[in-house]
Amino acid sequence: MIAVVVVAALVILALITQAGVVVLQRSYPAQGEMVEVTGATLNVVDIGPRDAAGPPIVLIHGASSNLRAMQQPLGDLLAGRHRVILIDRPGHGWSPRMREADSTPAIQGQMIDAALERLGVGPAILVVHSWAGALGARMALDYPARVAGLVLLAPALYPWSGGVGWHNDVVTTPVIGPLLAYTITLPLGYFLTEPGARHAFLPQTMPENFVSDTATALLLRPREFLANARDLVTLKAAVREQSPRYADIKVPAVVIAGDADTTVWPTIHSRPFTAAVPNAKLMMLPGVGHLVQNAAPELVMGEIDAMIDGIAQGTRAAAN
């Protein structure tokens, strides 16, 4: 009898989840265009003047997120003067994930490089947040001709002690993880998404309507939830493998981090990176947490503009 009740409950939760997925996707439809590359289809939003002076700016989101989180407010502000390209990483937003193995910065960087090639974009300024810090660094190593400069916002770059949350370990467990993702994640997440987002902003206050404006709830779809967890649990091994190469990054790099960030500790990630990379500088923002692009968008814009000006000056000097 108990088994029958459990099975019936799981079936009901699965049906609720599938109905919830339909509602979410109707509430937050895809934007931009789908770019086909080998092994992936990436959702890309291209805004701002195509003929803007200077390199285009590519914004790449972190974990538990999608391109809308980078568009508001930073992308929209930059698009007033620059060509701005926003990309849903594979498995996030409206970019599907084809394989479980497509969770590493190296593989995702290969796909994004191919998409930028299809779009005729590059070299570009890569502006990357959190998890995508490792991706941006990897692209600068593997595809230096594509990267004119790096702006890393609260980046994750080095191995750390501890894990990434027990729930991510559970979700990436065979059989159990998918069972949970397709039954309880969406109903439970409906109540936890906004508190979780508020926590990520601390000590700053989350902007009003942030969760709805950035389609954060898309994360609750089973496939995206599984992909996000896989990204997180495989990141430590990925940065352990690539971090010894950071000294080979030659492009200008700016790291902007908050000294109150308890999600990605600057002492573990930002400071060692700027010490290792020859042409890198670190900006520590007092009292700022993990969402530096929301806490100080004007400052981030200023650093991007300064980098573009510096690249232009270097190009003119080389020509003379």
Where are these regions (language model features)?
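Conserved alpha/beta-hydrolase catalytic His-Asp/Glu region
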Residues: 23-24, 164-165, 185-248
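Active-site loop/oxyanion-hole signature of alpha/beta-hydrolase fold enzymes
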Residues: 45-51, 86-131, 163, 302
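Catalytic active-site module of serine/aspartate enzymes centered on a nucleophile-bearing elbow/loop
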Residues: 280-320
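Conserved HGGG/HGGXW glycine-rich cap/lid loop of the alpha/beta-hydrolase fold
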Residues: 47-94
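Short glycine-enriched nucleophile-adjacent loop
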Residues: 133-144, 150
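Conserved loop-alpha-helix segment in the C-terminal half of the alpha/beta-hydrolase fold
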Residues: 254-288
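Flexible "cap/lid" loop of the alpha/beta hydrolase fold
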Residues: 141, 150-181
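Alpha/beta-hydrolase fold catalytic core
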Residues: 1-55, 80-82, 122, 309-320
